[in-house]
């Protein structure tokens, strides 16, 4: 039986804009009110996804959410026609309108936490959508995320879908952006690392002072229970509160793992040595590589600005590992120098491939934000909705779809344009036919 780690990238939605919605995310705040290009953003994402498929990796796409989200605007008291609702919201509550127009679902690292069948007691692949309660614009995503995941992984013989956790800050859950999995082989039982920012039920425990800790220990423990994980294959690690306060809002901004490699910054975690020992003990006797980047070589500020750790570490068909990095890493002298040195060291990482995802980067999301990792065996891959898997035909079809429906430029003030609702719904309705998703959106029901 062959085993793979698939990447399911978020297709950037038609309302991709820079509204500066994400407190704690430095890039998002710094680029607030800039002009975006939904068309460029979608094409950059597709190009990156296709390149990984061409490298021989299993690559899928996850559909975007319906935006503007008129259903939520109606829930909070706006009424009338679609045009009237947008007009009223723009005048009376512009911040709420912006929140209901975000294309943030493109960052599918926050879509869900995924545990492969090799790790779970029932031998199924488990999905729990993240509730994303810390940010209003993301907290309205989980129900549709669940619909899209179920339409993509739609065979109950192999896939188990859970409801997102209770919508309360005690269970603040940001999905796979705070989760990674180490294993000797993708098909072997691994060690799942859950990284949290604070303990909700322990006020005296360490936590950041400036920016919010979006993930709680309680949420991570709940997901592990839902996924039927063994305690011997689970490690809970607290992220260093000081780096959260420097803009490291998710763990995938300061660390990333793949198979037997954990690539992380020296300041990423609390109690680092004790936790590395726990990982090693639970991992077993197989080779395990801890690749620690010292502050003396890459400062936290450079790591955040370049998104050195918001890279994908992937295993190529040759068995070597490669880092999929944003071009911003080439533009930062300290980071570029480090990556050039890294590929010469005694680790499985032997090459770095650079991609332009600047439209996403300017909103605070690098290559790793754009993908949800799903480790699968060949039977599970065959059970996935095949219309969501990247190949030459889907790449061509989705690029044509973007050309047909997406705007070249979008300003925040354009979000109140009633035509944008029509354009977005028309595009998504066609997309559900291309990807054979069924009626996953509110407007289709």
UniProtKB/Swiss-Prot annotation:
Pfam families: AstB. InterPro entries: AstB_sf (IPR037031), SuccinylArg_d-Hdrlase_AstB (IPR007079). Keywords: Arginine metabolism, Hydrolase. It comes from the Bacteria. It is an enzyme of class 3 (hydrolase). GO terms for biological process: arginine catabolic process to glutamate; arginine catabolic process to succinate. It catalyses: N(2)-succinyl-L-arginine + 2 H2O + 2 H(+) = N(2)-succinyl-L-ornithine + 2 NH4(+) + CO2. One of its GO terms (molecular function) is N-succinylarginine dihydrolase activity. Substrate binds at residues 19-28, 110, 137-138, 214, 252, 363. The keyword Hydrolase applies. Its EC number is 3.5.3.23. The keyword Transcription does not apply. Pathway: Amino-acid degradation; L-arginine degradation via AST pathway; L-glutamate and succinate from L-arginine: step 2/5. The active site is at 174, 250, 369 (nucleophile). Gene3D superfamilies: Succinylarginine dihydrolase (3.75.10.20). HAMAP family: AstB (MF_01172). Belongs to the succinylarginine dihydrolase family. Catalyzes the hydrolysis of N(2)-succinylarginine into N(2)-succinylornithine, ammonia and CO(2). Homodimer. This is N-succinylarginine dihydrolase. It comes from Shewanella pealeana (strain ATCC 700345 / ANG-SQ1). The gene is astB.
